[in-house]
Amino acid sequence: GVYEVENGITVRELIELAGGIRGGETLKAIAFSGPSGGFTPAILPRGAWPRKIQRLLPANIEQVNILDLQMHINYFRLWDLMLGAGIVVYAQDADLVDQALACLRFYQTESCGKCVPCRIGSTKLAEIGGELAEGRLTRSELEELATETGPITELASTMASTAICGLGTVAPNPLMTLLRFFPEEVRRYARP
């Protein structure tokens, strides 16, 4: 649906306004800007917070329930979260590997092909997502992909700094956030 609400409404209030999560299930993840922003987990552990937020909030707060976050562009900027376009809510039974692959394939087909970083990069991301979903990657290969200096981060950085348009900067986000925030879900797809 389409909802127009005041700045500052919480994520929980918006989801309730939209009818809640299907079947009364609990929230697993949310994409605040559609696939462009990637997947934000329902519970955001302190280690995943931007440093500026870690300094602002008391040390005894170990995690934040994303449902309690106020939806205001300035707050989202502080949290390094995107806000805009469509918001997608994923219930506990959602397969985020499947969802990430669908997003990666979407970006691959949406690339106009004019710039090489986006054309090649979005294709490579979709290939990696396909290998993950088909169970062709080992645990060690998946761990390498998830590192801050791994090939996904390097590819994302190259795409962001050399792509002609914004598509190249956001195309890696579904896979990057999947690997960062949902390692247990990714491991279920690992080849023994």
Residue ranges and their predicted role:
Residues 1-192:
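Redox cofactor-anchoring modules in respiratory/redox and cofactor-processing assemblies
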